[in-house]
Amino acid sequence: KPEYDNKERLKDFRIDNDATILITGNGLNGKKADTLELYTRAAEIEAAIFGNTVHVTTGANVIDANTGKVTAIEGKGKKPEIAIDVKDLGGMYAGRIFLIGNEKGLPIDIKGAIESQHMVLDNQGNLYHAGTTHSMEDMTIHAKDIRNTGTMASSRHMTLQADGQITNDKTIGSVGNMAITANQVTNHKTIASEKDLSITTTSEEENAL
């Protein structure tokens, strides 16, 4: 809900209930706006979202209306099981895409397609990626654990960072540089870069590359 200061100016947006935004049917076309911003406890995407710049911010949060700063708060009601759930028939198509999961422990699950010029994904829970995600420019992804059984590709640079493990069972690729940082990396299929490839692990356990 929107909150206002004592001069009745929009101050911030407070998301503390258990509501979920559901995108279904013919999807959501935000191309007439410069920026499409979705603030919700959780998002379920069963159809396509189109836009120029798309922000999806989930979790129990207060979002500053002027700066966009996201501050986690205590949520009410039933805690969702998934922060952002992109179904098989769901997808996002935009110049710039920002997917922010700010509630600890909630995963992002991507089974559909995401196409962008520039993409940022930052989640406080795990990322389960079984779909196809492609960025024409830079792609930056951070999550607790990352499990890829789909295709993640960047036509420029890619940065993958996990607080725990990165497990790849299909394809992760970039035309530009790729930097991977995790406690442990397990690769069963293809991790490839046409330029520099850097893999940094912090665990003393053996990594399977």
PLM regions and their residue ranges:
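Extracellular and secretory-pathway beta-repeat/beta-biased strand scaffolds
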Residues: 1-209
